[in-house]
From Swiss-Prot:
Protein name (database record): Phosphoglycerate kinase
GO BP annotations, alphabetical order: gluconeogenesis; glycolytic process
Catalytic activity: (2R)-3-phosphoglycerate + ATP = (2R)-3-phospho-glyceroyl phosphate + ADP
Species name: Buchnera aphidicola subsp. Baizongia pistaciae (strain Bp)
EC number(s) reported in the record: 2.7.2.3
Record keywords, A-Z: ATP-binding, Cytoplasm, Glycolysis, Kinase, Nucleotide-binding, Transferase
Similarity-based family: Belongs to the phosphoglycerate kinase family.
Subcellular location as annotated: Cytoplasm
Amino acid sequence: MSIIKITDLNLLNKKVLIRSDLNVPIKNNKISSYARIHASLPTIKFALKNLAKVIVTSHLGRPTEGIYKKKFSLFPVFKYFKKILPETNIYFSQNLTECSSIKSGELIILENVRFNQGEKENSKILSKKYATLCDIFVMDAFGAIHRNEASTNGIIKYAKLACSGLLLESELKTLNSALTNPVRPMVAIVGGAKVSTKFKTLTTLAKISDTLIVGGGIANTFISIDHNIGKSLHDPKFIEQAKILKEKYNIFIPTDSRVSTTFTYDSIATIKSTSDIHANEEIMDFGDISIKNMINIIKKAKTILWNGPIGVFEFKNFSKGTEQLSKAIASSDAFSIAGGGDTLSVVEMFKVQNNISYLSTGGGSFLKFLEGNKFRIIELLEKHFNKFKNNNF
């Protein structure tokens, strides 16, 4: 994979448009997690330090294209940038035409790209508009690398020069190394609700890991191969595929569970063998024996790849499995990678973010990468490498 890195380029006085992933959770105009902002900062700071004219853009949420809605605005993100970069002149722009007067060492945060008509359909007209804003386009949004949209894909086709940012470079390098040359034993943990959305991921990780631990609705699907699981969330269409994986690979499936007859925050948890679930009961977390056995597996690991909670961690009586999992990974000497879906929320909830070796910012892109998918955006960046190699920029 040959891609120009931002560190390869002379940025002095150049207009540099950085496509970041600033898709942070915002409620009542307040940001509840700053993880993606802080992950994007090194690239932005690097460009500012090298006296580029820096323009940053991102998506946030899923607004109706072409229609402004305050709850999807990046304005709270802009305000946070003002707070953490107090010595930098930072501006907020809702208009692509307002970027012409920017000076070296200054920063403009553009409004949510998904307010722009043509963003999601990868409009040629919009892509060209983005490209005219800059001398150099920097793709740094690993979390959007699987989305072929105007601000991620189309712009690369028309930009004078396109490169990777520090975050994208780090994500690709770390994940590629973990998947192709892991230090063994390698343990993968995949939780979440549905097998259907993660079946390719499960198959890939079952093949390359020494042990695959399954949790959540995914584990319930595996349990249902041999046992009645009552009214537990599972994916009946994938039972046969799950059976094939179970027979072929080393998959850890819980043997006891925390169950309840109701699904509320205050539901009472009862620990039962997975072979003794009643019709009116629902599996909501690992039982203590399964937690202990899972921790013993994690203790022996040298590489850990974690995606998703293994229980209904939002409910206090069903958070133990996910909490103990996160703490076991955090206290392990193994190289650990966590990412995708609710994983970052779990990491922050149980305050283990400083003890995970690498936190991936990707959601769907994290899973797509684990599945071994090829990304069109990477192919487009590689074309710019060939252009750069043959011409001094």
